[in-house]
């Protein structure tokens, strides 16, 4: 292949090193000693610039970026601290207002409590009056039903018995009266006949007796007969029965007595209730009003200052760590770079022999010598292929991807990503301290809730004391009379039973009716009265009221629920609508951290884009190499280059001379001037010597001199520029 086109030259055309040395042997360039004065940098000069290697500079740039980021982060944290202090003051003010809410709410709650108690008492009074009236009427009705039923019952029995007795006596009297009168009349008639005969007999005797101066009395029993005719049973028999009949009690006295006795306690209770609670008004001044609260947790608690002090210490520590680590790394990287420079120097010395042998592609030799690592990597990768064309393409692709410009872009991208990684580590170190701030803020909320709970509990206890006093007053002044009235009713019922029993005893005592009437009374009235007394005893035992107490957390339950039981962070009473964090203080810190995070993210994206540019460049070279990799060279008839006319050696290699051939007359001539090369015919030489890096392949170098053109730095294979 031909490696140049007609009319082009390499500018400037430098003579081989040593061609100006008059002491050099004829036909060869004599190099200077490396430790002497040379136009290029020797080993010591190269080692003196080890600290200027790219890795040290990149690490220092990364260090500078990290320090700038740490400084900016510290400035942002200072701003966040000021905002957090302001937010804490706002929270403190709001917390004080929240803690003082019992002071403002208690007035309304007290009014509500008083109104509720008044309504309850008024309802209780109405209920009691209605209940007392109903119980009074019910008891009186019940007692009247009982004794009137009993009155009707034994009136029926007694009157029926007396009526039957009176009927029997009346029939007996009529019979006796009629019989006695008839007997009297019959006896009267017989006596009259006998008396008439006797009187006639006696009249004769009287005539005789008159002669003797005497008179026989006549018999006259008509008067007695008349008395016999008029005989009848005495009316006292009917009078006794009428007395029994008329003596049946009507219980009017019992009715009046029981009614008066029963009504008295009920009416007294009504009067007392109306007198004591008729116009009941709850004493609102007795209910407590809590004092205002002033919270000072921002001044008393150093949680925020502690958090930001820890953040500042973390940033300073990270700055020191990065400073120490990166400086040490930048210093230590000089060691392998120095070792690399030594190896590079030795490699350059070894590979400089290729130049002296005048047997290889000069551009390839220059590339191998100037870029030993990338060239070595390309040669190593190309060794996997047996085809020389593919070996060349592999080396070209690697050289394309590792050109100075490409490596600059790659190193810039990696340095940017490494700087982003350092900033990310610093950011994560700060984020790990955020839960401490959240915990501190949670304690702020707990302090507010605790203050609310204490104030609410104290107010509730005082209010409950007032309510208990009112309940005791009602139980004593109102329901105490209920207890008294139930006792009085029980006593009245006992008096009713005793009075009724006394009436029955006075009326039927000693008679055969007393025992049955007593049994009937116990059955009809006694058992019912006992049941009523049992019910009144139950009322007496349970006649009291207990107004419900005010809960201790009535004024703090909402705030406590927003802190402990809320599933949404925005439900916290410390949060503003739309806050994504649990409170305003951590929202300030998170906003700063998110800002820093966005900056790191932006830098990462930029570095990734720079890395993508290098990757795209690598893909361009790889795609072109792959296209040529699977292609073939064109023949001359297809537009390819002219055939190479040279004779290979016995090993099949064609020696390719370098650009400049040592001047055999140089020993007797002065050193040449550095000028544009003159147009000279191509010089072809055939040399072959073994060297470490192998052969550059079959080459033919042609240099056409042109005084006004600069030679291209592209490697040319044939007449096609790659």
From Swiss-Prot:
One of its GO terms (cellular component) is mating projection tip. Keywords: Cell membrane, Conjugation, Glycoprotein, Membrane, Transmembrane, Transmembrane helix. It is a multi-pass membrane protein. Glycans are attached at residues 177, 220, 238, 245, 274, 279, 454, 461, 483, 490, 505, 564-565. Residues 1-54, 144-320, 428-609 are extracellular. GO terms for biological process: plasma membrane fusion involved in cytogamy. It is found in: Cell membrane. This is Plasma membrane fusion protein prm1. It comes from Aspergillus oryzae (strain ATCC 42149 / RIB 40). The lineage of its organism: Eukaryota, Fungi, Dikarya, Ascomycota, Pezizomycotina.
């Amino acid at each position: 292949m031909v490696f140049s086109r007609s009319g082009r030259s390499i500018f400037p055309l430098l003579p081989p090193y040593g061609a100006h040395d008059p002491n050099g042997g004829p036909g060869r360039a004599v190099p200077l000693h490396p430790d002497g004065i040379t136009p290029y940098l020797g080993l010591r000069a190269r080692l003196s610039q080890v600290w200027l290697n790219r890795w040290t500079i990149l690490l220092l740039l990364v260090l500078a970026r990290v320090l700038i980021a740490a400084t900016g982060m510290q400035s942002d944290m200072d701003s966040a601290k000021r905002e957090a202090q302001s937010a804490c003051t706002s929270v403190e003010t709001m917390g004080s207002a929240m803690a003082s809410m019992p002071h403002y709410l208690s007035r309304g709650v007290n009014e509500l409590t008083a109104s509720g108690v008044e309504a309850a008492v008024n309802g209780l009074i109405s209920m009691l009056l209605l209940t007392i009236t109903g119980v009074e009427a019910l008891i009186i009705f019940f007692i009247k039903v009982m004794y009137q039923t009993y009155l009707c019952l034994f009136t029926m029995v007694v009157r029926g018995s007396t009526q039957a007795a009176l009927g029997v006596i009346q029939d007996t009297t009529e019979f006796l009266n009629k019989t006695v009168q008839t007997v009297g009349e019959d006896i009267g008639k017989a006596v009259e006949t006998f008396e008439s005969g006797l009187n006639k007999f006696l009249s004769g005797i009287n005539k005789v007796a008159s002669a003797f101066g005497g008179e026989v009395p006549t018999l006259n029993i008509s008067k007695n007969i008349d008395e016999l005719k008029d005989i009848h049973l005495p009316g006292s028999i009917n009078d006794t029965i009428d007395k029994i009949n008329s003596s049946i009690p009507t219980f009017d006295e019992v009715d009046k007595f029981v009614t008066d006795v029963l009504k008295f306690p009920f009416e007294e209770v009504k009067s007392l209730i109306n007198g004591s609670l008729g116009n009941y008004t709850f004493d609102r001044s007795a209910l407590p009003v809590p004092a205002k609260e002033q919270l000072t947790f921002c001044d008393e608690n150093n949680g925020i200052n502690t958090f930001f002090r820890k953040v500042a210490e973390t940033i300073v520590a990270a700055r020191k760590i990065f400073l120490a680590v990166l400086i040490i790394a930048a210093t230590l990287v000089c060691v392998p770079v120095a070792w690399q420079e030594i190896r590079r120097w030795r490699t350059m010395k070894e590979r400089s022999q290729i130049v002296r042998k005048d047997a290889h592609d000069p551009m390839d030799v220059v590339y191998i010598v100037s870029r030993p690592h990338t060239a070595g990597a390309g040669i190593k990768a190309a060794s996997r292929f047996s085809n020389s064309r593919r070996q060349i393409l592999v080396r070209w692709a690697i050289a394309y991807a590792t050109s100075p410009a490409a490596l600059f872009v790659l190193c810039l991208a990696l340095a940017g990503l490494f700087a982003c990684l350092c900033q990310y580590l610093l950011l994560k170190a700060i984020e790990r301290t955020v839960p401490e701030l959240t915990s501190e803020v949670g304690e702020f909320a707990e302090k507010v809730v605790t203050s609310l709970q204490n104030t609410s509990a104290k107010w509730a206890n005082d209010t409950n004391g007032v309510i208990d006093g009112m309940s005791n007053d009602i139980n004593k002044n109102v329901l105490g009379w209920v207890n008294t009235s139930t006792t009085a009713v029980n006593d009245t019922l006992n008096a009713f039973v005793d009075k009724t029993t006394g009436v029955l005893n006075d009326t039927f005592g000693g008679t055969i009716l007393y025992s049955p009437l007593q049994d009937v009374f116990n059955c009809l009235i006694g058992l019912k009265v006992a049941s009523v007394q049992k019910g009144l005893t139950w009322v007496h035992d349970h006649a009291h009221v207990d107004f419900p107490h005010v809960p201790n957390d009535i004024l703090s339950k909402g705030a406590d629920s927003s802190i402990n039981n809320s599933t949404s962070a925005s439900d916290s009473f410390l949060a503003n609508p739309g806050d994504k964090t649990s409170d305003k203080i951590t929202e300030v810190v998170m906003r700063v951290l998110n800002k820093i995070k966005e900056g790191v993210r932006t830098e990462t994206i930029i570095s990734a884009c720079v890395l993508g540019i290098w990757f795209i460049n690598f893909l361009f070279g790889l795609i072109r190499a792959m296209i040529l990799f699977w292609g073939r060279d064109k023949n001359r008839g297809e537009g390819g280059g002219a055939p190479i006319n040279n004779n290979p050696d016995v090993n099949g290699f064609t020696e390719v001379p370098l650009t400049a051939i040592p001047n055999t007359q140089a020993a007797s001539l002065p050193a040449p001037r550095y000028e544009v090369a003159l147009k000279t015919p191509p010089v072809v030489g055939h040399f072959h010597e073994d060297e470490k890096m192998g052969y550059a392949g079959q080459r033919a170098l042609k240099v056409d001199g042109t005084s006004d053109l600069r030679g291209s730095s592209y490697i040319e294979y044939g007449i096609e520029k790659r």
